[in-house]
Amino acid sequence: MALNLCTSPKWIGTTVFDSASSSKPSLASSFSTTSFSSSILCSKRVGLQRLSLRRSISVSVRSSLETAGPTVTVGKVTEVNKDTFWPIVNAAGDKTVVLDMFTKWCGPCKVIAPLYEELSQKYLDVVFLKLDCNQDNKSLAKELGIKVVPTFKILKDNKIVKEVTGAKFDDLVAAIDTVRSS
């Protein structure tokens, strides 16, 4: 049995068993297509005719890296963009989601950023996101109705339920507690 592997970083492993050997299955770590081909040579007693059979099977395996959406780490703030924001919010389901809408040039945004990071470590049942309201994400910022930075949007069940504008840490904590307890 011949085994041909084509490598590609977007395809990831499968277990392959070579029936020609008695070895255990092995793990092929990176591949896009696996082709198995086997030749069977049979001889009949009458006339010693030979039969050649060739069979090819192509198997494609999708990587969980390609099919999975953006990931969020508990206890960390995840930076999102216009393409990743809604998939993460949808995946959060009924969890509370807090979005920090900031810009890199905003002084109050820089002041509250480390405190926001601490909140993500305190509230492990809440998803903490941040969105840089630059030109690339302008459409999402407009969709979410941003007027000033920083603005914190608190979402539950894919809907904005609270908003805190400005670097008002105590107001943000109170809003998060209110939404979590509802």
Curated annotation (Swiss-Prot):
Disulfide bonds join 106-109. GO terms for cellular component: chloroplast. The record marks 107-108 as: Contributes to redox potential value. It holds the Pfam family Thioredoxin. It is found in: Plastid, Chloroplast. PROSITE patterns: THIOREDOXIN_1, THIOREDOXIN_2. The record marks 100 as: Deprotonates C-terminal active site Cys. InterPro entries: Thioredoxin-like_sf, Thioredoxin_CS, Thioredoxin_domain. The keyword Ribosomal protein does not apply. Residues 1-69 form a transit peptide. Keywords: Chloroplast, Disulfide bond, Electron transport, Plastid, Redox-active center, Transit peptide, Transport. Residues 70-181 form the Thioredoxin domain. The active site is at 106 (nucleophile), 109 (nucleophile). Its main location: plastid. The keyword Disulfide bond applies. Belongs to the thioredoxin family. Plant F-type subfamily. Participates in various redox reactions through the reversible oxidation of the active center dithiol to a disulfide. The F form is known to activate a number of enzymes of the photosynthetic carbon cycle. Forms a complex with heterodimeric ferredoxin-thioredoxin reductase (FTR) and ferredoxin. This is Thioredoxin F-type, chloroplastic.
